[in-house]
Amino acid sequence: MKKTLALLLAAVMLLSVLAACSSKAETPAEPEQTTEEPAQTPDAPAEETTEETTAAEEPSQEELDQAAADEVAAMIDAIYVQTRTNETDAQCEAAKAAWDALTDAQKALVEGDEASPDYFGLDTGDASKDDPRNQDDIGENELLVVSFGTSFNDSRVADIKGIEDALQEANPDWSVRRAFTAQIIINHIQARDGEKIDNMTQALDRAVANGVKNLVVQPTHLMHGAEYDEMCEALEQYKDKFESVAIAEPMLGEVGSDATVINADKEAVAKAITAAAVADSGFESVDAAKEAGTAFVFMGHGTAHVAKVTYSQMQAQMQQLGYENVFIGTVEGEPEETSAEAVIEAVKAAGYTNVILRPLMVVAGDHANNDMAGSEDDSWKTMFEAAGFT
């Protein structure tokens, strides 16, 4: 009986303890709710945090400037192409409008795969002095002058337009028209200056639409290179649309099988460019320049095309004419003996101390202004000066 009573008392005590513990554990729950409510009451700190976050998310002026410049760079890259599309006109116009809307600071930030501030910002002369020669009313006889092209306005007016004007004067019964083979140049001129120049397809379509019967194509290309080949391929598609088609030779004539095969065209050009270089530099003759330790270096473009032997032929022609202080080089270094490094070594080995650089190109455009006479470390002028020449 006593044991039973003891067990009952123990059970009652255990239940009391458990109830007390349960009561103590639940009691703080109310204060927890009470303490949380005051923490939510003040609204001011939360608003300040939101304002600070919004301010931090707003782009800086520098970021806005870069974004505007990047947009224009993308538009330039889009028109910096070799093919023309139905969108080209609109793209050129939109890119120029976007450029004009930039501040000077934003224009300086324009950089893309091909884009730079110079695309629109470089002053190359007055484009209004040029004549794109893309007019209709051609007549039955057309003389189509085909050039690679240049975006340098002054050079285009002096060189390409100069050739076209001379041909028109010499052939008054023929209508002289123009075509460029470099769509990249055509797009650049159109976007920057609003001047539209025909590519080969446009020029030939124009001739057909105007009822041209006799077509003579005169390239201003230096030699039978890739551009000349592409021109001939384009003409092949239109031969049956005219009564007669004639294609003239490039300036240096036939390529020849090797460096020893030199034609009359190369001889005439070699004499003409050397005489002009001698006269412009103030010497009485090429021999007088030689006596003064002066060498003339003519820089061509260069090519991986089989026609690259033309440059070797021109060097051989200079030697045959007795022009020992005249050297032929190329921007591309093709063929290898025409690279800047190779020519510098050749001039140095011959003992000359003064060098006069001249372009071996129909147009003194980007290559002549930058690759030859520019101030960059890889320009020929800089490289010759670094080698100790004056």
Task: Give names to the regions the model predicted.
Residues 58-124:
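Beta-rich interaction/scaffold domains
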Residues 39-75, 116-142:
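N-terminal low-complexity, Pro/Thr/Ser-rich intrinsically disordered segments
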Residues 22-24:
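Bacterial signal peptide processing site
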Residues 1-9:
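Positively charged n-region of N-terminal signal peptides that target proteins for export
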Residues 16-20:
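C-terminal motif of bacterial Sec signal peptides marking the signal peptidase cleavage site
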Residues 32-39:
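Short extracytoplasmic/periplasmic juxtamembrane "stem" segments immediately C-terminal to an N-terminal membrane anchor
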